Design a protein with these regions (language model features):
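Short, hydrophobic/aromatic-rich segments at coil-to-beta transitions
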Residues: 48-55, 84-91, 154-162, 180-184, ...
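Flexible, processing/modification-adjacent segments and terminal tails
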Residues: 24-32, 103-171, 177-181, 189-192, ...
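Pepsin/retropepsin-fold aspartyl endopeptidases
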Residues: 78-82, 166, 174-178, 182, ...
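N-terminal mature ectodomain segment of secretory-pathway/periplasmic proteins
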Residues: 28-117, 296
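A cross-family detector of function-defining hotspots
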Residues: 60-62, 150, 318
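Bacterial N-terminal signal peptides
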Residues: 11-23
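Bacterial N-terminal signal peptides that target proteins for export
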Residues: 2-14
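Beta-turn initiation residues at beta-strand->coil junctions
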Residues: 57-59, 93-96, 111-116, 163-166, ...
Length: 533
C-alpha cells in the first residue's frame, strides 16, 4: 500500500507524449523496440487500429485460492472486457453477478467499485495505471529505451529494455532479439515490494499481421489470463471512457444527531480506542465499527446468519497483516443509520465471527455523504452533499485525501524532511504503524528504542485478517507533523513492507481522538477540527 497525496492530472496530449519513431539514434534498445513493434504489427496511435476491444478470462485461479463447491463456482466466474482508443481505456470486470470498472479519460485515471462509487487515482496509483496502460495499449515501443542487460525467460535469451513513460513508473521489457517477441514486462522493477511482473506466454492475431498478447501470467500468485477475443470495434466515442454513475443511493433524513460510542481498551503501552454505532441492516439492528481504513462495508457472521442473503460473488479481504479471509459479496436492500437510509448497497459478508461487532462501516458508507463526527458530544450527523457545504472552523484544516484505494491517505513528515504516506484509519486503535522499510533504511531515527522504561517492546497486531505471524518492533519518535498539527513523542510500530510498501502505514485512533472529524468524500476532503481532548 504505497500511497501518495498529490493528485496528478494527465492532459490527453501529455499522456500521449511518446517519443516519435523517426529520429532515434541507432542503438540496441531502439533496434529491439523497433523489432518488437514489427512483431506486433502496430503500435498505439496506429490509424489502422483506431480502437481495440479485448475479452479476457482466467484460465487458472491464483495459487492459494481457497477451494470451493460446485455451487460456488459461478460466483467466481470472471470476465474482463478491455476497450482501448490510443491510451484511453475502459476495463470492465464481471465477477459472479457484480461488476467493477476502471479507466482513463485522457485526463484522469479512475476506478469504480461494485457499487459504482468512483475514485480518482492519485500520484502513485495513477503512475502505476499509466505504465500498465502504456504496455497494454502497445505504446511502450514508441518510447526511448535504455539497455538493462539480459536474462533467460522460458529457456530463451532476452535483452532487457527499460522505458520510462512521462508521469509513469519505469517499465522493463524482456525482448527476444531473434524475433522481437516480448516475453515479460516488469513495472517498477527497482521496487522490491510494489513491482508488477507479467509473463507473456502467447500472442494471437486480431487482424492480418497484427498481434496482441493473449496469454498472461501475473504476479506472485501465478494467475493466468487468456485473451479469448480481440476485435477492432467501430463507433467508439469519448463517453465510453467516463466513469459510471453510482448504483447505491441515500435517502437523507432530518440531519438529527446519531449516538456513537467510544470504547476504551486498556493495554500495556496505552489505551486503545474505537468508535462504534448502531445501524439497521434490512431492518435488523447491528453494532458497527466506524472504520475509515476499510475499503467497503463488511458484515460478520453474527449478523449475516440472521439476514439470509443470496451471494452475488465469492470474494475475500485482507487487513493489517496481509492475510486473506474468504467472503461473499451480497446486496443489502437498506443500511439505515439514524433516519438516513443507504439503498441497494453491495457489501462483503464474512464467515468470521467477532465477539463485539456485527460489522465494519468503511468507504461505501462514506462515499456519497458528508459524515460529521463530534467526539465531545458523542454523536455523528449524516448530510446530503447536494444541500450542505462543509464549514471549516478556525484552527480546523480541510485535508485533501488520496482515495485511490478507497481509504483516505495523506502525507506525514518526520525529522530530516522524511515523508510517509499512510492511511488515516479510525479503525486502528493504535498510534502510528509504518512500513518497516522506513526503519531498516535509516530514514527514520527514533528518539528512543524503548517505549516504557527499559522495555524493548514488540507488539503483535490483530485485525480483520487475524493475528500477525510475528511481532512488530516499536520505538518512540520525537514528533510527527500532520499538516500544521504536531504529534509529539509518538509511539510507532513497524509492519510488513510487503503490506505497506516503502513508505505506507496507518495513522490510528490515538491521533483522531484529538479532533472532531468531517468526512467529505464527494469533495475529496477530510476536515479535522481540534476538540480540546
Amino acid at each position: 500500500m504505497n500511497k501518495r497525496s498529490s493528485w496528478t492530472a494527465f492532459p490527453f496530449g501529455a499522456a500521449l507524449a511518446l517519443v516519435p519513431v523517426l529520429g532515434w539514434a541507432a542503438s540496441a534498445p531502439a533496434d529491439l523496440l523497433a523489432k518488437h513493434r514489427a512483431f506486433m504489427g502496430w503500435a498505439a496511435g496506429d490509424p489502422s487500429v483506431p480502437a481495440l476491444k479485448l475479452t479476457i478470462v482466467p484460465s487458472k485461479l491464483p495459487e492459494g485460492t481457497p477451494t470451493i463447491t460446485a455451487s460456488e463456482s459461478a460466483q467466481r466466474a470472471l470476465r474482463i472486457t478491455a476497450l482501448y482508443r490510443g491510451l484511453l481505456f475502459r476495463r470492465t470486470q464481471e465477477y459472479g453477478k457484480i461488476t467493477s470498472v476502471s479507466g482513463f479519460t485522457g485526463r484522469v485515471f479512475w476506478r469504480s467499485n461494485e457499487n459504482a462509487n468512483t475514485v480518482r487515482l492519485f500520484d502513485s496509483a495513477a503512475r502505476e495505471a499509466l505504465s500498465l496502460d502504456v504496455v497494454s495499449a502497445n505504446g511502450a515501443t514508441l518510447l526511448e529505451g535504455t539497455a538493462r542487460g539480459g536474462a533467460t525467460v522460458r529457456n530463451r535469451h532476452t535483452e532487457i529494455v527499460r522505458v520510462d513513460p512521462q508521469n509513469g513508473f519505469p517499465i522493463d521489457l524482456y525482448i527476444d532479439p531473434a524475433n522481437g517477441e516480448m516475453l515479460r514486462y516488469v513495472i517498477r522493477p527497482d521496487d522490491a515490494y510494489d513491482n508488477t511482473t507479467v509473463q507473456v506466454e502467447g500472442y494471437k492475431e486480431f487482424a492480418p499481421g497484427k498481434r496482441v498478447a493473449s496469454i498472461l501470467r501475473t504476479g506472485k500468485n501465478r494467475q493466468s489470463l487468456d485473451v479469448t477475443d480481440a476485435i477492432i470495434p467501430t463507433g467508439v466515442i469519448d463517453a465510453d471512457f467516463v466513469p459510471p454513475k453510482p448504483k447505491s443511493s441515500w435517502t437523507f433524513g432530518t440531519s438529527a444527531p446519531i449516538p456513537v460510542t467510544e470504547l476504551l481498551r486498556s493495554g500495556l503501552i496505552a489505551s486503545g480506542r474505537s468508535l462504534q454505532f448502531h445501524a439497521k441492516v434490512n431492518g435488523i439492528e447491528g453494532n458497527f465499527l466506524f472504520d475509515s481504513g476499510a475499503s467497503g462495508i463488511l458484515i460478520f457472521k453474527s449478523l449475516a446468519d440472521r439476514l439470509n442473503l443470496t451471494p452475488l460473488a465469492a470474494s475475500g479481504y485482507s487487513g493489517i497483516n496481509g492475510g486473506f479471509v474468504s467472503a461473499r459479496e451480497v446486496r443489502l436492500d437498506t443500511f439505515q443509520v439514524g433516519d438516513n437510509v443507504l439503498h441497494d448497497v453491495i457489501v462483503q459478508s464474512s464467515n468470521s465471527p467477532l465477539t463485539d461487532l456485527d460489522g465494519i462501516a468503511g468507504y461505501d458508507f462514506l462515499a456519497q455523504a458528508i459524515v460529521d463526527v463530534d467526539l465531545v458530544k458523542k454523536h455523528m450527523v449524516i448530510l446530503d452533499p447536494a444541500k450542505f457545504d462543509v464549514n471549516v472552523e478556525k484552527n480546523a484544516v480541510a485535508f485533501p485525501v488520496d482515495l485511490s484505494s478507497s481509504q483516505p491517505a495523506m502525507p506525514i513528515k518526520f525529522a530530516g524532511g522524511v515523508t510517509a504516506h499512510p492511511i488515516f484509519d479510525t479503525g486502528n486503535d493504535f498510534f502510528v504503524l509504518l512500513s518497516d522499510d522506513m526503519r531498516n533504511s535509516g530514514k527514520i531515527v527514533a528518539l528512543s528504542q524503548k517505549l516504557i522504561g527499559d522495555i524493548d517492546l514488540r507488539v503483535t497486531f490483530g485485525g480483520v485478517d487475524g493475528s500477525a505471524p510475528q511481532s512488530a518492533p516499536c520505538v518512540r519518535l520525537t514528533r510527527v507533523d500532520v499538516g500544521p498539527y504536531v504529534y509529539e513523542t509518538v509511539p510507532v510500530c513497524f509492519g510488513n513492507p510487503y503490506v505497506f510498501g516503502k513508505d505506507g502505514g496507518l495513522v490510528g485512533y490515538d491521533f483522531f481522538r484529538h479532533f472532531n472529524w468531517t468526512f467529505d468524500y464527494p469533495d475529496g476532503k477530510l476536515v479535522l477540527t481540534p476538540n480540546g481532548r
